[in-house]
């Protein structure tokens, strides 16, 4: 069955969908000896697909990993600035896995990694609206801060859906919230705090869809169970089946 090349490369764990598109544009991908262009399709079972002259990798077993990411790690597999990356934290899993979505360097908590490109792309697609829940520590809190934080704002030209906000603790101008969002805009929760007149000092993701961080130690990872993978495929907080 023919599929778009970037989807094939992603499904084989050779690159993320975006990176695969970059490789195709750079002329690094060929099909049956002919340099591919973006939009080309191929059959991975019958066509000779190569990346930088190397044949397409044999299909790997699907691996799904939950990492409790510490602060100070970038959510990439390598970093041109030499900063610590999450790849080093999961190197002993024995498979090349890719982060599902982003968690910025200054944030911590639940991060999914997998070599199942189709699963990752579906989970990240905006139409599924997978809910993500964070514990958020702020300074600059004033009474009513939770109501300001819960107001919809416009980020990057897009009006986000009103988040769910619960005040967990407040002492003077310091507070802790639990915030659930539906999108995944760049540094979204931190920018929401700024818009509400508060400064986010710590951010920890504790849940994505039906998957919870639980008591997994910081910097450690574990495999998802079959039930957890199935729960993400059909999870509360999505607009249908992934």
PLM regions and their residue ranges:
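Basic, flexible Lys/Arg- and Gly-enriched helix-loop patches that mediate nucleic-acid binding at interfaces
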Residues: 1-242
């Amino acid at each position: 069955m023919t599929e778009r090349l970037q989807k094939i490369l992603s499904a084989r764990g050779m690159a993320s969908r975006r990176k695969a598109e970059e490789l195709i544009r750079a002329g690094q991908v060929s099909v049956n000896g002919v340099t591919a262009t973006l939009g080309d399709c191929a059959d991975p079972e019958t066509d000779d697909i190569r990346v930088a002259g190397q044949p397409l990798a044999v299909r790997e077993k699907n691996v799904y990993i939950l990492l409790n990411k510490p602060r100070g790690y970038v959510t990439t597999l390598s970093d041109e600035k030499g900063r610590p990356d999450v790849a080093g934290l999961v190197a002993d899993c024995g498979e090349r896995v890719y982060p599902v979505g982003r968690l910025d360097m200054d944030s911590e908590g639940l991060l999914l990694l997998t070599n199942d490109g189709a699963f990752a792309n579906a989970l990240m697609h905006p139409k599924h609206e997978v809910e993500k829940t964070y514990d958020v520590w702020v300074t600059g809190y004033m009474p009513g801060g939770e109501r300001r934080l819960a107001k919809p704002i416009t980020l990057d030209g897009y009006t986000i859906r009103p988040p769910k906000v619960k005040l967990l603790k407040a002492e003077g101008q310091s507070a802790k919230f639990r915030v659930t969002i539906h999108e995944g805009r760049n540094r979204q929760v931190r920018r929401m705090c700024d818009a509400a007149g508060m400064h986010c000092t710590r951010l920890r993701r504790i849940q994505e869809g039906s998957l919870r961080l639980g008591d997994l130690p910081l910097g450690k990872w574990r495999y998802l169970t079959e039930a957890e993978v199935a729960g993400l495929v059909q999870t509360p907080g999505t607009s249908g089946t992934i």
